[in-house]
């Protein structure tokens, strides 16, 4: 997780643009997904029955690129040095390329959330048509406060509850920080109550405790008739000495002084 934090912050610093806070805050969640959970192959990244991963919070793209790099997908350290540069593999927001392990394009808030619901619906349909011996996989994703504020995500979430998409598991990066300050200044929504009211299975965990995250995902996989939302309490910019848990780490480089610390 330290390597993910360092490489994410360094890439944003080199580009002088980007969002280091979310990758640093979701390092444990990302590590658990790629180390313990996702059924994917770096040798056959576009395998039809792979698990899908949706980084709905696409502004935190360096989390995905660092995870793909450390798991031997076709994202090299030189590619990461080209973060946010024209024609690079590592765009500011992820752009779909299944050969690299990037399942969908994300960035506009809420869009990835809704697309993931579509992916889970497709899995459910194709599993019935083709059989579970051919299609039997999960859709996992990381969603942000900003995603959940968007109308498109709530509409899609309600459909997921109606359709009982038990193969859909989202992890909510609940850090209470936006680019403009604390989320609770603009939203008082109880996400647990909201999602439970529309047919979701909801759990709460410490977003920096890997064993809790693993256990929550295991429990969610056992809930066959409901989509799951795992609310991961996290600290944006975790381990940035002076900027963690502040809006300043959301959408700007840490700065040379902070990087040296």
Which role fits each region the language model picked out?
Residues 1-138:
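Thiamine diphosphate
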Residues 42-43, 98, 102-261:
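Glycine-rich ThDP/TPP pyrophosphate-binding loop and its adjacent helix/strand module
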